[in-house]
């Protein structure tokens, strides 16, 4: 294992990879994470299925699905589906469930809603719009080693980030105070249509659509507080250090904000953002060191850091550090655009992009290189897959065809902890040989009626490899 320093601007969160499972989990995320290692949550997710757009041609565990934005939401985006009282403080009125609004019951009561040929018409008649209220796609079910989920906080992390036009849908079942609730449908419960012999549509909770819309509720389900440390391999707690700094114009990087309310004056950013509440024995006593809590503030296998606040440089920082501070002053130190705009737009606010994460981390480079145990592999003959997905040469991996070595260069794949399979064409099976042919002809005319000549030929073969196939021995 090697120790390395890192520095990262905190506008560079990891998008299209980490998601909250419903608006309830978003509303309660900060509270649930506020007293680590004790979890302020009575949730326990027991089962989950994760479905993504089937881009790799998988035929098993693949089917037509419809992801619905409002399914399971007590306060649906389309108010016409609301059945629970608005603003209720009763926890039973806030919990996500298929019965939380009328959308799911309306769909399953329609006998044609599960037919792939008619489901789009059914959804249109309900007033639902594609890419906004729902997404229909042919999806594959991820295996359990292709993602991580926190069963108490209610967030999901994929091993490999989704492409912008890919769809993500889930079904999950959880308990709360001993009662069982479910959002979406599990594939084992919705089998083939026995009458027509076709696979029935599976209804899921939509977490990501084919387009990013900041005005829709699912925008808030994509987490913007998870950062990659760009490390090959897994994180190790030993010698791990992390600090949060503010780049003050003309003054450099500081551990403190230049201006805060008096109640938190003198507190470092790492404390303000609840990243330092514990000592090395996990007692609630800040010690100036990042709180390394596996599965909560750190995802070691993925090489990720999770902030315990959903908007650490937006509204959350405002509520913590700038109470009673004039908004004209506080807005100089806040970065709300990071959570209100798509990432590429938010990064254009250079005057607000002043937060930096730096420290040191120990990890392993193991697994970055794969030996093919062959030499002089034919160029272009190597195919690499991760979790069934075809990787791109030059983007995800590089090949030294002479030495027969594949090097994975995509840190997301290395840290994902999923199997990488390599197939290639081996020259050994072709008995490749070098051949040489030489010939000489000499003629001498002694007289008009007499001449004589001499001819010599030589054919030789030299195998490229010391071992040759039987019957293909080199000649000389």
Describe every region a protein language model picked out:
Residues 1-476:
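Surface-exposed, low-hydrophobicity segments enriched in Gly/Pro/acidic/Ser residues
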């Amino acid at each position: 294992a090697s120790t390395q320093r890192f520095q990262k601007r905190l506008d560079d969160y990891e998008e299209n990879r980490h998601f909250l499972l419903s608006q309830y989990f978003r509303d309660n995320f900060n509270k649930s994470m506020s007293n680590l290692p004790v979890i302020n949550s009575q949730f326990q997710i027991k089962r989950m299925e994760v479905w993504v757009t089937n881009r790799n041609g998988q035929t098993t565990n693949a089917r037509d699905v419809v992801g619905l934005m409002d399914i399971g939401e007590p306060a649906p985006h389309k108010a016409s589906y609301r059945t629970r009282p608005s603003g209720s403080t009763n926890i039973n009125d806030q919990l996500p469930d298929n019965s939380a609004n009328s959308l799911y019951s309306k769909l399953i009561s329609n006998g044609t809603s599960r037919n792939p040929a008619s489901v789009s018409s059914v959804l249109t008649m309900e007033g639902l719009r594609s890419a906004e209220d729902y997404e229909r796609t042919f999806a594959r079910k991820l295996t359990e080693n292709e993602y991580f989920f926190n069963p108490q906080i209610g967030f999901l992390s994929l091993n490999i980030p989704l492409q912008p036009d890919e769809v993500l849908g889930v079904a999950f079942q959880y308990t709360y105070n001993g009662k069982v609730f479910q959002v979406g449908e599990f594939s084992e419960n919705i089998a083939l249509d026995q009458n027509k012999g076709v696979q029935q549509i599976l209804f899921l909770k939509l977490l990501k659509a084919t387009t990013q819309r900041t005005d829709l509720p699912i925008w808030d389900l994509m987490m913007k507080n998870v950062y990659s440390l760009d490390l090959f391999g897994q994180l190790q707690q030993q010698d791990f250090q992390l600090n949060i700094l503010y780049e003050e114009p003309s003054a450099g990087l500081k551990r403190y904000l230049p201006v805060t309310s008096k109640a938190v004056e003198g507190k470092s950013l790492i404390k303000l953002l609840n990243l330092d509440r514990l000592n090395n024995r996990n007692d609630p006593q800040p010690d100036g060191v990042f709180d390394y809590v596996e599965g909560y503030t750190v995802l070691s296998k993925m090489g990720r850091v999770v902030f315990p606040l959903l908007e650490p440089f937006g509204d959350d920082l405002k509520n913590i550090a700038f109470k009673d501070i004039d908004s004209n002053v506080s807005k100089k130190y806040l970065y709300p655009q990071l959570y209100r705009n798509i990432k590429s737009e938010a990064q254009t606010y250079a005057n607000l992009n002043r937060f930096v994460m730096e420290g040191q981390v120990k990890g392993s480079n193991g697994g970055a290189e794969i030996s093919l145990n062959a030499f002089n592999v034919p160029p272009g003959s190597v195919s690499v897959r991760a979790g069934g997905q075809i990787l791109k040469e030059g983007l995800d991996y590089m090949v030294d065809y002479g030495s027969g070595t594949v090097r994975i260069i995509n840190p997301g794949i290395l840290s994902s902890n999923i199997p990488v399979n390599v197939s290639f064409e081996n020259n050994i099976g072709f008995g490749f040989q070098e051949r040489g042919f030489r010939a000489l002809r000499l003629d001498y005319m002694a007289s008009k009626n007499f001449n004589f000549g001499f001819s010599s030929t030589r054919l030789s073969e030299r195998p490229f490899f010391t071992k040759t196939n039987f019957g293909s021995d080199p000649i000389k």
